[in-house]
Amino acid sequence: MGNKFRGGMPGMGNMGNMMKQMQKMQRQMEETQKRLEETEVTATSGGGAIEVVANGKKEIVSIKIDEDLVKDGDVEMLQDMVMVAVNDAIKKVLDMSESELGKITGGINIPGF
């Protein structure tokens, strides 16, 4: 009876391929994350009277408020509309990130990305 395993442990070639695939996936995720960080999304409320722009790092880049809203003097309504637009912008960023990174991971949630 000869040695069936010739040159090492069975399955180790597959392990090497898996490691290469994981490294490739990590590179793709890092590239995608960098691209996402540079992407901006816009959300509005009040029929476009409030506009919020956020980037892929979940940072608010700008907020524009129609002057007529300020003239009305309804601060509470203005605050609510800003909050709605900010929350919508953040949700858009999260959805965009989840969608793009999900294409790489096949839907597996990987912490830190």
UniProtKB/Swiss-Prot annotation:
Biased-composition ranges for Low complexity?
15-26
Pfam (any one):
YbaB_DNA_bd
Presence of keyword DNA-binding: yes
Q: What are the UniProt keywords, alphabetically?
A: Cytoplasm, DNA-binding
GO cellular component, alphabetical, reads: bacterial nucleoid; cytosol
- Which coarse location class applies to the principal site listed for this UniProt protein? cytoplasm
Name the residue ranges with Basic and acidic residues bias: 27-38
A molecular function annotated in GO for this UniProt entry is: DNA binding
Annotated InterPro entries: YbaB-like_sf (IPR036894), YbaB/EbfC (IPR004401)
Q: Show the segment(s) annotated as Disordered.
A: 1-44
Subcellular localization is given as: Cytoplasm, Nucleoid
Q: Transcription regulation as a keyword?
A: no
**HAMAP family, alphabetically?**
DNA_YbaB_EbfC (MF_00274)
Q: How does it assemble?
A: Homodimer.
List, alphabetically, the PANTHER family matched: NUCLEOID-ASSOCIATED PROTEIN YBAB (PTHR33449:SF1)
Question: Member of which family?
Answer: Belongs to the YbaB/EbfC family.
Functional note: Binds to DNA and alters its conformation. May be involved in regulation of gene expression, nucleoid organization and DNA protection.
Q: What is this protein called?
A: Nucleoid-associated protein FMG_0513
